[in-house]
Amino acid sequence: MYDYAFVHLKFTIPLAVLLTAIAYPVLNRIHVIQTGCLIFIAFTAALPWDAYLIEQKVWSYPPEAIVGPRLLGIPFEELFFFVIQTYITALVYILFNKPVLHALHLNNQRNPPAWMRIAKVTGQLILVALSVWGWKAAQVNQKTTYLGLILVWACPFLLAIWTLAGRFILSLPWFVTVLPVVLPTFYLWAVDELALHRGTWSIGSGTKLEYCLFGKLDIEEATFFLVTNMLIVSGMAVFDQYLAVIYAFPTLFPKVNRYPTPLMLVQSRLVNTTKYDLERIEGLREAVERLRLKSRSFYLANSLFSGRLRIDLILLYSFCRLADDLVDDAKSRLEVLSWTAKLNHFLDQHYGDSDATEDPKQKAERIDAYIKEAFPPFAYQALHLLPTHILPPKPLYELIKGFEMDSQFTFHGSSDSTNLKFPIAHDKDLKTYAIRVAGTVGELCIALIIHHCLPDMSDSQKRRLESAACRMGIALQYVNIARDILVDAQIGRVYLPTSWLKEEGLTHKAVLDNPEGPEVIEKMRRRLLDNAFELYREARPEMQQIPSEARGPMIGAVENYMEIGRVLREKKVGQVFVRKEGRATVPKQRRLRTLLRALYEQ
């Protein structure tokens, strides 16, 4: 009795609830709109087709297997299947695609490799052939009727989608398109096999080939679930392609609302690919790789941000890391001062007093010329793509001052011990340094979040958030220093305040010679961590005021980094994993648990 309803209660609804619970922390309004639009399209496209199948006796349902209500002869349980299948497959697609930055896969839209052009044309020809064959096969009362009706209905839609987004789909990593098709398909095959075995629904004899994939699962039913899931996944990819165009190219779409409008999606489809700034895509690719190599915690957290905010945060990190590397890789203090002077002049080019009548294009060309003249080629993209039109100048200048403080340390390999200089003399110097190299980054991140998520935020709320972000940045830097005492000592640096060392009867040389030895160093590490967690507890409640789209990912990034401090405090075997260079980190599973806990708490 009511077997079809129980199929949903036992198999489709529980899976949908489970996937919703898993995906909930990363879902945003764009995902909801995207999935809702696809459900509407799938429902309206399948409705007349399904009604025709029932009218022609291809599908039938025993009266006792359904609740009763119908629309165009279609049981409500079947109508619900249109919705729930689309929802399930869309969620699987979203989960697999969340780490992917789709903008990186737009470069093949203009200059695709030969294999991609061949694959797209081949796919089009195959879909045309299947559509024609399906039309001929879909004659009433013959063994190919059902299979033909599936192909003549689905293949034209697939052909249209493949024509629109074939290159983009081929550009994506295979697992983000193939697995969202395969996994729901296998699950629904198993559900269908059980339903057919119980007689919940049946396929009319004489309209099918009488071949089964396994058990009672007819080849036609297997084909149906496969092609419908292909439609859903490729439909989601079309949305993502046009969203990627909107987010990736600010010259084409200077102002993007929190949620792009349908008109913007149409406009992104109509943009000629010759207008794509492929140099920007390449620069973004470099920035992502720099983030991946240099910060595993923030690389993981960044994938949870969305839209242009995610891109601008990556570009900000790339600039900060590049500037830091220029200082750290310098061979002399003079070279460090040269780099900091050039970085300051670069900022002056953007923020300094300039001729108000200067054409913006000429200004951009002037700045580009300076970058190419003053910096090595590998630095060009990180400097060129920095979103200075959004970022406030003061934190950027303060960041450079932080690098200048680094330049006061003895350089690795120097044999002149008489010139040792350690700029962190007192607590206030430690705080100043942390503000400059980390508090500023927190302020810059908040500036990007406010610009993209809530530009009309009140000034008082902005100031509170900026202050909290600065304090949290200081806390993270204290954790960083506590973690890297050994690593810093290996390059001649001691960030522990001189006053702390004197209290414990230590010298800088003692720390450099044996950074992990004396118990008093561990005592100072704990003191540093205590300061970090005190600042963390002060700033953490204020972070709840971050706009909802960015709150979870931002807090997740913070919690992931503070977890390093927690495991340093615990000192449990297996909890702190020390890499070869002496830097402690958190096991991957624990990082993931920390991130998920932070997201679900939001």
From Swiss-Prot:
Which region ranges are annotated with the description Lycopene beta-cyclase?
Answer: 1-241
Tell me which Gene3D superfamilies the record gives: Farnesyl Diphosphate Synthase
What is the top-level taxon of the source organism? Eukaryota
One of its Pfam families is SQS_PSY
Q: Which GO terms describe its cellular component?
A: membrane
Q: Give the EC number(s) listed in the UniProt record.
A: 5.5.1.19, 2.5.1.32
Task: Name the Gene Ontology biological process terms.
Answer: carotenoid biosynthetic process
Metabolic or biological pathway, per its Swiss-Prot or TrEMBL entry: Carotenoid biosynthesis; beta-carotene biosynthesis; Carotenoid biosynthesis; phytoene biosynthesis; all-trans-phytoene from geranylgeranyl diphosphate: step 1/1
Chief place where the protein resides: membrane
Membrane topology field? Multi-pass membrane protein
Summary of the function given for this chain in its UniProt record? Bifunctional enzyme that catalyzes the reactions from geranylgeranyl diphosphate to phytoene (phytoene synthase) and lycopene to beta-carotene via the intermediate gamma-carotene (lycopene cyclase).
- Please identify the protein, giving its name as recorded: Bifunctional lycopene cyclase/phytoene synthase
